[in-house]
UniProtKB/Swiss-Prot annotation:
PROSITE patterns: ANK_REP_REGION, G_PATCH
UniProt protein name: G patch domain and ankyrin repeat-containing protein 1
Keywords, ordered alphabetically: ANK repeat, Isopeptide bond, Repeat, Ubl conjugation
Biased composition regions of type Polar residues, renumbered to the chain: 220-233
Organism listed in the record: Mus musculus
Gene Ontology terms for molecular function: nucleic acid binding
Gene3D superfamilies: Ankyrin repeat-containing domain
Chain intervals with Basic and acidic residues compositional bias: 330-340, 348-357
G-patch domain sequence ranges: 271-317
Length: 372
């Protein structure tokens, strides 16, 4: 009876559609894969910590076997291998060429650091008068020395000769001058040479030694080594000379001292300025011209203070005025007196005539109203 009822229900078309729709909309369940490791399981809402694996302890036999295998691999790798492709060889060559180029800058920096360190050692040895250390640092590398620069300078432009002269080390000064240390025109940042530094420190004999070092006397070996040269004429000394060191000789320097002394004109430039120091370092004397023989302009170049807003060439050029004034000089900001224009003068004259006419009329009316 139940089976026949079910057959009648399924025979209805609408009920058959509902049954098929219900079967299609039934949700599909997700099948979860159980955890294979017990450490991944969650218990009581918390994940269980993983068990750390104990690292194997390397005993002596294992270490010996490892090194023997490593040596065997090195010996086997020394066997000739097959030729690499051309592309791989080009890549390796390009990589090797690029690496030294990238390492060029640090090498240059290291070279500069070594040069500065060598200069500091030479200056210290000259100041202490250590001739043994000076010979070791200044002798060429072919002779077993370090090959240092005898005219090396520090940040304050001090040379080894300046340090030795300032410290009064006569033996070191004589050795440096004998090796050809330069001092003519070589000044520090304050414009002082080695002779002046020795005089300031109270060593006049060292200063005299420095000034007389470039005389015309020569040692016998230098006389035999010198070759005859053509005679030349010196305009400063007014005589002919054949010595190549004539311009640094005592006679030439004395003839230069007979020149007209520089004038004491104020330049308006402090002696501590970098430009003044550069001129002194180049051999310039204060007050003399800027030419090689002390000729040329000695005063500042006249300039013009442009105080208006007119274009260039609008009016006649004003008189040049030197702008190198001293401190707190009121002439630097003083201007010319204002000159009124013609239109301004005519307006003032008209107002004056009108005021005069009103005064005459006022006096006339006052006179006519008087009773005698």
């Amino acid at each position: 009876m139940v089976g026949s009822l079910a057959c009648h229900i399924l025979a209805l078309p609408s009920l058959h559609f509902l049954v098929s729709l219900t079967g299609m909309s039934r949700p599909s369940f997700i099948e979860f894969t159980p955890a294979a490791d017990s450490s991944d399981l969650w218990k009581d809402g918390q994940q269980q910590p993983q068990q750390e694996k104990a690292e194997p302890v390397l005993d002596g036999a294992a270490a010996r076997a490892f090194y023997e295998a490593l040596i065997a691999d090195d010996s086997s790798s020394s066997k000739p291998q097959r030729a690499e492709p051309m592309r791989e060889r080009k890549k390796k060559r390009r990589r090797v060429t690029r690496e030294p180029a990238a390492a060029g800058v640090p090498r240059q920096g290291r070279a500069l650091e070594d040069e500065d360190r060598m200069a500091q050692w030479i200056l210290l040895a000259a100041q202490n008068g250590d001739l043994t250390e000076l010979r070791r640092l200044l002798e060429p590398q072919e002779a077993g020395g370090a090959g240092g620069n005898i005219n090396a300078r520090d940040a304050f432009w001090w040379t080894p000769l300046m340090c030795a002269a300032r410290a009064g080390q006569g033996a070191a000064v004589r050795y440096l001058l004998g090796r050809g240390a330069a001092w003519v025109g070589v000044c520090d940042l304050g414009g002082r040479d080695a002779a002046q530094l020795a005089e300031e420190a109270g060593f006049p004999e060292v200063a005299r030694m420095v000034r007389e070092s470039h005389g015309e006397t020569r040692s016998p070996e230098n006389q035999n080594r010198s070759t005859p040269s053509s005679s030349q004429f010196c305009e400063d000394c007014g005589a002919h000379f054949e010595d190549s060191n004539h311009h640094t000789s005592t006679a030439h320097l004395l003839s230069l001292s007979r020149r007209p002394q520089p004038s004491n004109l104020p330049l308006g430039v402090p002696t501590s300025s970098p430009g003044f120091r550069l001129l002194l370092r180049g051999g310039w004397e204060p007050g003399m011209g800027l030419g090689p023989r002390g000729e040329g302009r000695a005063n500042p170049i006249p300039t013009i203070l442009k105080r208006d807003q007119e274009g260039l060439g609008y009016r006649s050029p004003p008189q040049p005025r030197v702008t190198h004034f001293a401190a707190r000089d009121t002439r630097a900001v003083s201007g010319r007196e204002r000159v009124p224009r013609v239109a301004t003068l005519s307006q003032r004259e008209n107002r004056r005539q009108e005021e005069k006419g009103r005064a005459w009329e006022r006096d006339l009316r006052l006179y006519m109203n008087l009773e005698f």
